[in-house]
């Protein structure tokens, strides 16, 4: 379904930043960017990821799993409140996708973070198979989340491969 710009403005006007579900769904406002909101949401996820790197990996994983569970609800509810499924302003799914992607970094150097960001954004925007299948066939809050989860898992796999099996020094 194509949404005319005027209708997107109407949908955004239905957001209430005092509603914690809406605030999280739009990535603390990063998804309200008039240009490339998904990219802005992915960038906004990085400082939160950095704070999460101080957690033991088990707790980091638990935070991501809780983020997925909460995200299914908050994305569904926010989309319902806005009257648009998977509105571009809803970027919590990008947060989760980035956190999954960045779990696979061999080191926390900024070059690896940038590589993870670029790989995730390319996959999230391009939506190759199987990402596209999930995007088209799963609906509701899970439908909003799942394509970014799959893009994050694939991005993490690519980063892991590059970091552990590619000739040394490529990104160092």
Swiss-Prot record:
Its EC number is 3.1.3.27. Its main location: membrane. Its cofactor is Mg(2+). Keywords: Cell inner membrane, Cell membrane, Hydrolase, Lipid degradation, Lipid metabolism, Magnesium, Membrane, Metal-binding, Phospholipid degradation, Phospholipid metabolism, Transmembrane, Transmembrane helix. It is an enzyme of class 3 (hydrolase). The keyword Manganese does not apply. The chain crosses the membrane at residues 32-52, 54-74, 142-162. GO terms for molecular function: lipid phosphatase activity; metal ion binding; phosphatidylglycerophosphatase activity. GO terms for biological process: glycerophospholipid biosynthetic process; phosphatidylglycerol biosynthetic process; phospholipid catabolic process; phospholipid dephosphorylation; response to magnesium ion. It catalyses: a 1,2-diacyl-sn-glycero-3-phospho-(1'-sn-glycero-3'-phosphate) + H2O = a 1,2-diacyl-sn-glycero-3-phospho-(1'-sn-glycerol) + phosphate. GO terms for cellular component: plasma membrane. Residues 53, 163-172 are periplasmic. Residues 1-31, 75-141 are cytoplasmic. Lipid phosphatase which dephosphorylates phosphatidylglycerophosphate (PGP) to phosphatidylglycerol (PG). This is Phosphatidylglycerophosphatase A. It comes from Escherichia coli (strain K12).
């Amino acid at each position: 379904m194509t949404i005319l710009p005027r209708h997107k403005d109407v949908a955004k006007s239905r957001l209430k930043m005092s509603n914690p579900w809406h605030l999280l769904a739009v990535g603390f406002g990063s998804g309200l960017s008039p240009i490339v909101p998904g990219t802005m949401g992915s960038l906004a996820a990085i400082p939160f990821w950095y704070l999460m790197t101080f957690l033991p990996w088990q707790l980091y994983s638990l935070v991501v799993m809780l983020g997925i569970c909460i995200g299914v609800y908050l994305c569904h509810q926010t989309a319902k409140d806005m009257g648009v499924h998977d509105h571009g302003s809803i970027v919590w799914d990008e947060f989760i996708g980035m956190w999954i992607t960045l779990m696979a970094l061999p080191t926390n150097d900024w070059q690896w973070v940038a590589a993870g960001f670029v790989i995730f954004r390319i996959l999230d925007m391009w939506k190759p198979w199987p990402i596209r299948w999930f995007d088209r066939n799963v609906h509701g809050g899970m439908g909003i989340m799942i394509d970014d989860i799959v893009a994050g898992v694939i991005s993490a796999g690519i980063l892991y491969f590059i970091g552990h099996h590619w000739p040394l020094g490529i990104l160092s």
